[in-house]
Amino acid sequence: MKPFVAIIFCFLILGVDSQRWFQFMKEAGQGTRDMWRAYTDMREANWKNSDKYFHARGNYDAAQRGPGGAWAAKVISDAREGFKRITGRGIEDSRADQFANEWGRSGKDPNFFRPPGLPSKY
């Protein structure tokens, strides 16, 4: 049922034509994996002041997939930051995170936010 709803959503709201809906959904799935990978890398690195870098990197990687990836990155980022605002945790930090999210989605280099000393693995 959920894939069917997503497909209908793409047709009606996003204006994805019948030739591109499969590609859009594929990009969205890949973008979701990119966002998850950035999150797990952030947790694994556990590096001070690195969250903006991982936000930007996840959004950048997802957006590089195409319109579906950029859409998935925006939905995930907005949901995450919206949850922070609802719970009242760090409104200023949430704004900074959104700036990093938009920076990455726009195709700008996420290394702008890279903290000194972060291992090259990330």
UniProtKB/Swiss-Prot annotation:
Region entry Disordered, spans: 100-122
Tissue specificity, please? Detected in liver, spleen and kidney.
GO molecular function list: heparin binding
Which Pfam families does this UniProt record tie to the protein?
A: SAA
GO terms for cellular component: high-density lipoprotein particle
For this chain's UniProt record, which GO biological process terms are given?
A: acute-phase response
UniProt xrefs under SMART domains:
SAA (SM00197)
Q: Where is this region: Important for amyloid formation?
A: 19-45
Similarity field: Belongs to the SAA family.
Query: What does this chain do?
Result: Major acute phase protein.
Q: What is the protein name stated in its UniProt record?
A: Serum amyloid A-1 protein
